[in-house]
C-alpha cells in the first residue's frame, strides 16, 4: 500500500509537470538560454542573483539548471533570500546554500550593494527573478546596484527576462524627484513602468538612470545582455502566459497580488491606519479597520464611479500584522476593466472616502511613516497636496504628468 501511494504521488506530479509544459505559451529567459546552449556562459565562472521565482516552466530552479550545465560558483541573495525564507525587511545573512553548498552573498544585510570581494572569482553575473512591475519592489534596486559594481569591475551582467505581471502597457505615477531617491525609489521612472525586467535594465543602463541608492552618484554603464522570452506580448495577463506563478516574496502569492500591490502598497506604509489584506489571505487586496462600516464605505466608493473598478463589502480577521486577531470591516476591490482602471489611484480613492466618512487622517501618524510614504511615492507633493482636502482630483494631474514622456522614452527599449 505504501509503495502504491508513493507511485500515485509520483504519477500525479509527473502529470502536473506535463500539464504545465503543455499549457505554457511563453518561454522565460532561462529556457531560451538553455535552448541556445547556454551561450555566453560556457567556460566562465558564473554568479547567479536569484530567488525561488527563478524557475522554468517545469518548476526547475535556475540554480539547478545552471549548476548542471555551467560552472556556477556563487549565489547572491536579494530581499527574502535565495530560498525565500526571510520575511519582508528581515536581514539576509551570507553563508552557504544548504542544497548546493555554494557560497551565498547577501545583498540585503549589512550592505545592499555587492562588494568587489563578493564578486571576486566570477566572470559573469546572471540575474533571474520574477519582477512585480512596481518601482518600490526592491528586486530591481538590487539589480541596479549589482550592475554598478559589475561595471566598476568589468564584469558583464546577463538578465534572463520574465513577464511583467502588470502587462507591458500599464504606466502610472510620477518620476522620482531629487531628494527622494531611496532603495524603494531608486530610479527616475514611474511607480508602474510597463517594462519587463530586461527592458528596464537596458533603459536604466543606457539612459544614465543607474545613479546609486540615493540617486546622487555618477551614472555607470555595465556590459549588459538580456536573454529575451519567446511568445510574450505586452497585452498579456500573467495567466495567459501559461507559466506557473512562484511567489517572488511572501506577500505576493498570486499573480493578482502583484497587480494589487501598487493599488494598496502606499497605504501600507501607514501603520495602524488600514489593514490592506496583509496577515489574511488577500494581501494588498482589501482596505479594512475595526471602525469602518463596510456597506457605508462601499456606497461611498461606488459614488465616485472609478473607471474599471468595482467594490465589495468584506469582513475578516487577520491572523497577524495590523489589527491581528480582530474582526475588521471594509472593502475588497475588483478590476472590471483593467485597461482603463487607474490602479495606483485606488488607494487614494479609499483614503478620500475614509476621510469623508470618518475624518481619519493617516498623515497624523509618525513623521517616520510619512517620510517612508514620500520615499515610496518618490515625492512629497502627493502627501502635501492630498492632505489639504483629501481629494484625488487634487493630485491626479500630477500623478499622470510624467507618463506620456516616459512612454516615449521606454519604447526605445521594447523587446516585445
Question: Where are these predicted regions, by residue range?
Answer:
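Bacterial Sec-dependent N-terminal signal peptides
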Residues: 1-26
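Conserved functional hotspot residues or short segments at active or partner-binding sites
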Residues: 287-397
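Glycine/threonine-rich flexible loop motifs
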Residues: 131-143
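Glycine-rich, aromatic-lined ligand/substrate-binding cores of catalytic
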Residues: 232-314
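Glycine-rich oxoanion-binding loops at beta->alpha junctions
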Residues: 92-122, 134
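Conserved anion/nucleotide-ligand pocket segment
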Residues: 180-261
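Short internal beta-strands
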Residues: 73-80, 160
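Glycine-rich, charge-decorated loop segments at or immediately adjacent to ligand/cofactor-binding or catalytic sites
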Residues: 84-89, 158-181
